[in-house]
């Protein structure tokens, strides 16, 4: 796999003609005779527009943010602006401006996040680049399964269960620190990102990367909490109660927004409880949508002579299924009888139907006295 740094180098080479012809006025979308106030106003608008916190995951926006900062760094400095107006961006990048060694005038630029902090927070920005706080990530969605019998799906059910989930550590209040104090990350100076400056001949390219030491938080823990060992979270049992409505569909899901695992550095994700139907305990009924199906076996005598009746236990204990045939009424093998209103509940729309599939079991042989049946058939 090609390292990210090499990918950035390749992209930089491809963008070389564009970078060499950089127009700082065009980047800030202002005229060449723009006043200091207009330059500052343009920077304020564009830096907020392209700030990484508002464009998470967009490399293009991150690059725009760096370009806008670079343009403002030059045009807001009278000396740099004068050199740029006379000799172009290359002269500024190669040290045409004044300044001490390693400073902005020594062929380099201020960190774009430092510029942003000075503009919006008077140089006292906290972690996260000065644009409020970094966008809080959401924790992962957690999906759990519970199994219900067909009867529970029919009648509705109340389910209670407990899950062992991550939650903020009570001992350190989610700080991960025994004394509750966090130190500024020395690698990124609390910004959460590191700006790498690549110089290739006359070209200068700035690349923003998440700080590996602090994981982008801008802070590190020096004195770890003894309970959570600096993880900021501990496992806790959480109780849940779910009401499954009568007639709920198979694979019914109840979503609890923001009730999954949570921590101080992210918002809790969603908990999804999915209800599956058990393979057993269906009392001989099968479900397809809002309708129920059942197979009833008849003897040859019942099928041919009729005169029988059956009472079958139903999913509703107060509502038995009654089947019958008058005498001399034949039931064919594979015949289907529809019992209206004995399907699954449909809320205000009533009930589905029950389909009885009859299977006739014939004897292997007939007795001599049954030969008259052959003549009738």
From Swiss-Prot:
A motif (Prevents secretion from ER) lies at residues 374-377. GO terms for cellular component: cytoplasm; endoplasmic reticulum; endoplasmic reticulum lumen. GO terms for biological process: ERAD pathway; protein folding in endoplasmic reticulum; protein refolding; protein transport; response to unfolded protein. Transmembrane segments: none annotated. Gene3D superfamilies: DnaJ domain (1.10.287.110), Heat shock protein DnaJ, cysteine-rich domain (2.10.230.10), Urease metallochaperone UreE, N-terminal domain (2.60.260.20). It holds the Pfam family DnaJ. Residues 1-21 form the signal peptide. GO terms for molecular function: Hsp70 protein binding; protein-folding chaperone binding; unfolded protein binding; zinc ion binding. A motif (Cell attachment site) lies at residues 288-290. A zinc finger (CR-type) spans 156-237. SUPFAM superfamilies: Chaperone J-domain, DnaJ/Hsp40 cysteine-rich domain, HSP40/DnaJ peptide-binding domain. It comes from the Eukaryota. SMART domains: DnaJ. The keyword Electron transport does not apply. CXXCXGXG motif repeats lie at residues 169-176, 185-192, 211-218, 225-232. It is found in: Endoplasmic reticulum lumen. Residues 23-88 form the J domain. The keyword Zinc applies. Keywords: Chaperone, Endoplasmic reticulum, Metal-binding, Protein transport, Repeat, Signal, Transport, Zinc, Zinc-finger. Present with 8260 molecules/cell in log phase SD medium. Regulates protein folding in the endoplasmic reticulum lumen. Probably acts as a J-protein for the Hsp70-type chaperone KAR2 by stimulating its ATP-dependent reaction cycle and initiating folding reactions. Also involved in the endoplasmic reticulum-associated degradation (ERAD) process. Cooperates with KAR2 and another J-protein JEM1 to facilitate the export of ERAD substrates to the cytoplasm by maintaining them in a translocation-competent state and preventing their aggregation in the endoplasmic reticulum lumen. This is DnaJ-related protein SCJ1. It comes from Saccharomyces cerevisiae (strain ATCC 204508 / S288c).
């Amino acid at each position: 796999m090609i390292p990210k740094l090499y990918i950035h180098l390749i992209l930089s080479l491809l963008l070389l003609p564009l970078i060499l012809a950089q127009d700082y006025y065009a980047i800030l979308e202002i005229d060449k005779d723009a006043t200091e106030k207009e330059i500052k106003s343009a920077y304020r608008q564009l830096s907020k527009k392209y700030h990484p916190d508002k464009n998470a995951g967009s490399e293009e926006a991150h690059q725009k943010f760096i370009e806008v900062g670079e343009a403002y760094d030059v045009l807001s400095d009278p000396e740099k602006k004068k050199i740029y107006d006379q000799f172009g961006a290359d002269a500024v990048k190669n040290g045409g401006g004044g300044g001490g060694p390693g400073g902005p005038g020594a062929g380099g630029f201020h960190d774009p996040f430092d510029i942003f902090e000075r503009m919006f927070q008077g140089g006292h920005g906290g972690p996260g680049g000065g644009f409020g706080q970094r966008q809080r990530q959401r924790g992962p969605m957690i999906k759990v399964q519970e199994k219900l019998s067909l009867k529970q799906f029919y009648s509705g059910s109340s389910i209670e269960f407990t899950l062992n989930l991550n939650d903020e550590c009570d001992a350190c209040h989610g700080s991960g620190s025994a004394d509750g104090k966090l130190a500024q990350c020395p690698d990124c100076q609390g910004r959460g990102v590191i700006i790498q400056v690549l110089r290739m001949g006359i070209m200068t390219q700035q690349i923003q990367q998440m700080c590996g030491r602090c994981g982008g938080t801008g802070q590190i823990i020096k004195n770890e909490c003894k309970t959570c060992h600096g993880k900021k979270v501990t496992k806790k049992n959480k109780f849940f109660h779910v009401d499954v409505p009568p007639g709920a569909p198979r694979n019914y899901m109840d979503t609890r927004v923001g009730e999954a695992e949570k921590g101080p550095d992210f918002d809790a994700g969603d908990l999804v409880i999915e209800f599956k139907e058990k393979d057993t305990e269906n009392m001989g009924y099968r479900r397809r949508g809002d309708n129920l199906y059942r197979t009833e076996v008849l003897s040859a005598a019942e099928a041919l002579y009729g005169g029988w009746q059956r009472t079958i236990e139903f999913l509703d204990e107060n509502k038995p299924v009654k089947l019958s045939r008058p005498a001399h009424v034949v039931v064919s093998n594979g015949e289907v009888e529809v019992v209206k209103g004995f399907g699954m509940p449909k809320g205000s729309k009533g009930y589905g139907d029950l389909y009885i599939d009859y299977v006739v079991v014939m004897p292997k042989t007939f007795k001599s006295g049954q030969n008259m049946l052959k003549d009738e058939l």
